[in-house]
Amino acid sequence: MKKNTENTNAFLIHISAFAGFIFPFGNIITPLIAWQTLKDRSHFLDEQGKEVVNFNISYTLYVFLLTLTFIPFAIGSIFRKNHDFWNSNHFNFDFGFDNIFGFIGLVSITSIVYLTGIALVIIASLKAKEGENYKYPFTIKFIK
């Protein structure tokens, strides 16, 4: 295969992770299908496909664990202010400063994680377009 076509295909495998914004788990399914389709054409495409799929599985796992970490705090902060809910028949939505700062912290951490994921996919796509073998940071090797 020509090097230019190989680089373009590697670029497309990396950029296909943005399908996760269109449908659930698209960031895993789309690169997996692209990698399975193109992996026999060259060693470079095989390596980059594995790298993309491993990163997106790891990234999805990290986001899931982050969500699980914050759910108890979110539920606890809502019900802490509403401990007398069963006696008063109204729900108090006055969160106060502690909950506002908690919400701002949650939004900040979530934004950083999502923007980091987007930036890493863009960087990897551009490196693959140049023919470089890019390795994502913090990636668990599910597929070896």
Predicted segments, located by residue:
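Repeat-unit-sized solenoid/scaffold elements
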Residues: 94-111, 131-144
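Membrane-interface extramembranous regions at the lipid-water interface
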Residues: 1-57, 123-144
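Hydrophobic alpha-helical transmembrane segments in multi-pass membrane proteins
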Residues: 11-28, 54-84, 98-121
